[in-house]
């Protein structure tokens, strides 16, 4: 099995995990704000990382040599994640994910500058096809642009920065190290932002299972994403995430009765085709 195919399989795990996190995040959004959700999610994440690190003997892999890169990576991710959690509470899930999926396009544009990865015709074509698919799904108009849509679009830039610096970290750091600093720094950011008004809400018994799900799903998503980025270039890995759009569109329809039409599937078909062509091209090179 080629490294590219392995990376795609791990990205599939990330897609399922991110979708589960969206459902759980919406379920508790009426009780906790986005900063509080991020804070409690990070507490769960730290516990999981420390327990698994102790079990597998990988805690010794946590180093301080790239703290600056970890900080930039997690600031970028924290901003993107909070904007994303806000957007899923006010905008249909399919539209949030569609706008978020401009993230691979930012990765495509920035990777040659920050990671020294090169553009290829197929990678650019996959990115363009993904963007065209997103426009078909969302069909943005002047009336459709609101604060939730803007938040979803801005979250994509944050996630792109996170992906790029994650890729840089995978060159020298282990997954345990990356996930440890992810959870610790996100917790620190969450406490500061959630407590700025002196009032941090405690979760109820009803929301605890959802918070645990968010914590586990978020950590699993980042494990899969980090592993995928260690196996293949960011310009190959990130466009695979486009497949999450039709998945979450179906979730929105089945769970929240959100309207879905043929344009979602037409756009998704274009997105999938672009991804398939890119993966096929990279697999032939391997």
Residue ranges: model-predicted function:
Residues 86, 103-125, 246-265:
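C-terminal transmembrane-helix exit sites in multi-pass transporters
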Residues 15-23, 50, 74-82, 104-109, ...:
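Hydrophobic/small/kink-forming positions within alpha-helical transmembrane segments
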Residues 1-16, 46-72, 121, 173, ...:
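Membrane-interface interhelical linkers
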Residues 122-138, 263-282:
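Hydrophobic transmembrane alpha-helices of multi-pass small-molecule transport proteins
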Residues 23-26, 49, 143-203:
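Transmembrane alpha-helical segments that form core, pore/gating elements
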Residues 31, 87-90, 116-118, 172, ...:
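Helix-loop interface residues and adjacent transmembrane-helix termini in multi-pass membrane transporters
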């Amino acid at each position: 099995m080629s490294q590219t195919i392995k990376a795609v399989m791990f990205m599939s795990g990330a897609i399922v995990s991110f979708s589960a996190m969206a459902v759980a995040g919406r379920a508790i959004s009426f009780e906790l704000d986005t900063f509080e959700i991020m804070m409690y999610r990070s507490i769960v994440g730290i516990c999981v990382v420390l327990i698994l690190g102790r079990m597998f003997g990988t805690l010794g892999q946590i180093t301080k040599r790239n703290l600056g890169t970890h900080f930039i990576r997690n600031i970028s991710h924290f901003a993107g994640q909070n904007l994303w959690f806000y957007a899923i509470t006010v905008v249909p899930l399919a539209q949030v994910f569609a706008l978020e999926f401009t993230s691979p396009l930012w990765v495509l544009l920035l990777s040659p500058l920050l990671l020294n990865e090169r553009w290829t015709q197929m990678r650019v074509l996959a990115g363009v096809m993904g963007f065209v698919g997103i426009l078909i799904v969302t069909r943005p108009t002047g009336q459709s642009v609101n604060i939730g849509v803007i938040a979803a679009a801005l979250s994509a830039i944050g996630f792109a920065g996170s992906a790029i610096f994650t890729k840089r970290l995978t060159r020298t750091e282990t997954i345990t190290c990356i996930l440890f600093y992810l959870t610790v720094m996100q917790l620190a950011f969450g406490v500061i932002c959630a407590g700025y008004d002196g009032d941090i809400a405690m979760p109820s018994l009803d929301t605890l299972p959802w918070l645990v799900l968010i914590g586990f799903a978020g950590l699993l998503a980042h494990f899969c994403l980090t592993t995928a980025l260690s196996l293949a270039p960011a310009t190959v890995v990130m466009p695979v995430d486009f497949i999450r759009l039709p998945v979450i569109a179906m979730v929105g329809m089945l769970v929240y009765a959100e309207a879905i039409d043929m344009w979602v599937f037409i756009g998704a078909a274009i997105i999938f085709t672009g991804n398939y062509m890119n993966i096929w091209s990279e697999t032939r090179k391997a």
